[in-house]
């Protein structure tokens, strides 16, 4: 496939005209959800007396997408769990779930808690599938040097794969095993986990009916908000007249919104999703122009225009770039209007992040033209990490968030802290693993995969395996940094981890953004199909 022959939009004007079937019931659903929230709150408070019950309830609320309604209660419960020794430390399920939830919420818990579950020869002693699943998920919150967690993943994966061959394994549990082997719980997109887990929870014997009903209502209400946002961003996108003026780019506005919703799914982040969706779409145009369509001279003209950020620079650009450049400037200005006078300063950081992205892309063009191969993967990532766009998109989501994200937070982000680099590295390595064959055939710059092949004389398959190992190392970097206290809001670190999850999802088997038919069904589940209440 030629890199400039991307398939057309799969959605077109669908969300401009779409009327969700649940919209007329919005008032009733909201009223019912408010009643159920308080009922579930009482259940959560009652669970404080028993650690296992508390852990089970917290993980259930998280998987159903309800935890944001109970942030204070959950934080308080987990502080109690962290300080209490009143639990069975010989119960692997409890130990694993406790470890998972505490680390996920930023508590430093030692992985030594798992050594007691090994025999004298250092092998894990466990054959219960539910315990294996929980241990496997817990182990993925590992950092560097935690050998016991590395070993736990190897052991549990082997055991879980074997369990799938057991005809006596309950079907529900087998489905959970298959899903977990594909993507461990910590790396799943939270909103998609809710979609997948609601029907599973509905079949569990110990389900709480109030929680189940609330989860369904909560999703359907969120879906209505997403559809309103999709109408807005689709109308915004149509003004670019992509089909006529930019037919060579990836026309993916719905997929952009899907990506942003995967990272920031809570209703209160509506403006954040809209701004980040627009920025992702604009970054996609920039990438396709500079990477696959423009001549070197044209790409450098566009880069210089973005560095200067002046309207009159459009006069120096070729026709197909001119309208895009002016629309880019107009969009950033309109974001400032939406943010209001007290937060409009944030658009400065959108511009600065875009400039960093363009510098990285310019360096890659230079490599391509000179047939230059970076000497190390680190050298490659220094330039290709920023150009992948993941961090710029994450930062654009912060622009639309509340006042807890301060000017100091944005200044810190502009220094590209190590947490940011771990996100960029994960996104770049995943992107290269998924798309390297297509891009090399299209004459792109050397990817990290190709770089490794040339450095070590390996095959592409061998290089891809090594890049996957480096990706795991970057996840360990991220987890280590996530657990390190900083003066900045925890929301920043949490959102950066969420964006790493979206990269993992979009590039799991192939480039799901470019070849978006691979994610079309999931997009429909998120935006089109309401969950039945009965």
Swiss-Prot record:
It catalyses: (2E,6E)-farnesyl diphosphate = (E)-beta-farnesene + diphosphate. It is found in: Cytoplasm. The keyword Repeat does not apply. InterPro entries: Isoprenoid_synthase_dom_sf, Terpene_cyclase-like_1_C, Terpene_cyclase_plant_C1, Terpene_synth_N, Terpene_synth_N_sf, Terpene_synthase-like, Terpene_synthase_metal-bd, Terpenoid_cyclase/PrenylTrfase. One of its GO terms (cellular component) is cytoplasm. Keywords: Cytoplasm, Lyase, Magnesium, Manganese, Metal-binding, Plant defense. It comes from the Eukaryota. Its EC number is 4.2.3.47. One of its GO terms (biological process) is diterpenoid biosynthetic process. The keyword Magnesium applies. It holds the Pfam family Terpene_synth. Mg(2+) 2 binds at residues 287, 291. Mg(2+) 3 binds at residues 431, 435, 439. Pathway: Secondary metabolite biosynthesis; terpenoid biosynthesis. It is an enzyme of class 4 (lyase). Gene3D superfamilies: Farnesyl Diphosphate Synthase (1.10.600.10), Terpene synthase, N-terminal domain (1.50.10.130). GO terms for molecular function: magnesium ion binding; terpene synthase activity. Its cofactor is Mg(2+); Co(2+); Mn(2+). Mg(2+) 1 binds at residues 287, 291. The Asp-Asp-Xaa-Xaa-Asp/Glu (DDXXD/E) motif is important for the catalytic activity, presumably through binding to Mg(2+). Sesquiterpene cyclase catalyzing the production of beta-farnesene and alpha-bergamotene in equal amounts from farnesyl diphosphate. Involved in indirect defense by producing volatile signals attracting natural enemies of herbivores. Belongs to the terpene synthase family. This is (E)-beta-farnesene synthase.
């Amino acid at each position: 496939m030629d890199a400039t022959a991307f398939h057309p939009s799969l959605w077109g004007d669908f969300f401009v005209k779409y009327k969700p079937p649940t919209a007329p019931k919005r008032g009733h659903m909201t009223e019912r959800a408010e009643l159920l929230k308080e009922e579930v709150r009482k259940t959560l408070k009652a669970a404080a007396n028993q650690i296992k019950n508390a852990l089970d309830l917290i993980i259930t609320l998280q998987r159903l997408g309800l935890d944001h309604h109970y942030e204070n209660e959950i934080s308080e419960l987990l502080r109690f769990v962290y300080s209490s020794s009143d639990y069975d430390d010989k119960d692997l399920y409890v130990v694993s779930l406790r470890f998972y939830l505490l680390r996920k919420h930023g508590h430093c818990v030692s992985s030594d808690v798992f050594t007691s579950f090994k025999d004298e020869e250092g092998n894990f002693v466990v054959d219960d599938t539910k315990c294996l699943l929980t241990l496997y998920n817990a182990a993925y919150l590992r950092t560097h040097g935690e050998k016991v967690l590395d070993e736990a993943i190897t052991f549990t994966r082997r055991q879980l794969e074997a369990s799938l061959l057991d005809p006596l394994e309950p079907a529900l549990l087998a489905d959970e095993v298959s899903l977990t082997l594909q993507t461990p719980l910590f790396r799943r997109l939270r909103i998609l986990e809710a979609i997948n887990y609601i029907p599973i929870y509905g079949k569990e014997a110990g389900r709480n009916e109030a929680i189940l009903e609330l989860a369904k209502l909560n999703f359907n209400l969120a879906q209505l908000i997403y559809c309103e946002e999709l109408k807005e961003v689709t109308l915004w996108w149509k003004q670019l007249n992509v089909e006529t003026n930019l037919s060579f780019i990836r026309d993916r506005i719905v997929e952009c919104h899907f990506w942003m919703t995967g990272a920031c799914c809570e209703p209160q982040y509506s403006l954040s999703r809209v701004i980040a969706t627009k920025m992702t779409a604009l970054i996609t145009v920039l990438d396709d122009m500079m990477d696959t369509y423009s001549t070197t001279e044209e790409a450098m003209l566009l880069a210089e225009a973005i560095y200067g950020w002046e309207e009159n620079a459009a006069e120096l650009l070729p026709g197909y770039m001119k309208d895009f450049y002016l629309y880019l400037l107009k969009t950033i200005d309109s974001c400032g209007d939406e943010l209001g006078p007290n937060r409009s300063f944030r658009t400065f950081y959108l511009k600065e992040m875009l400039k960093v992205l363009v510098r990285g892309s310019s360096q890659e063009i230079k490599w391509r033209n000179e047939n230059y191969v970076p000497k190390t993967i680190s050298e490659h990532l220094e330039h290709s990490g920023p150009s992948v766009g993941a961090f710029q998109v994450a930062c654009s989501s912060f622009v639309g968030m509340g006042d807890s994200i301060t000017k100091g937070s944005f200044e810190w982000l502009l220094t590209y802290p190590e947490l940011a680099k771990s996100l960029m590295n994960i996104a770049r390595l995943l992107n290269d693993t998924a798309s390297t064959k297509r891009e090399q055939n299209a004459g792109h710059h050397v990817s990290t995969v190709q770089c490794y092949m040339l450095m070590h004389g390996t095959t592409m398959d061998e290089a891809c395996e090594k890049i996957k190992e480096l990706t795991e190392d970057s996840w360990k970097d991220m987890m280590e940094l996530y657990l390190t206290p900083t003066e900045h809001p925890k929301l920043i670190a949490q959102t950066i981890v969420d964006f790493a999850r979206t990269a993992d999802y979009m590039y799991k088997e192939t480039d799901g953004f470019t070849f978006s038919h691979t994610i079309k069904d999931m997009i429909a589940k998120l935006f089109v199909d309401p969950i039945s209440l009965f």
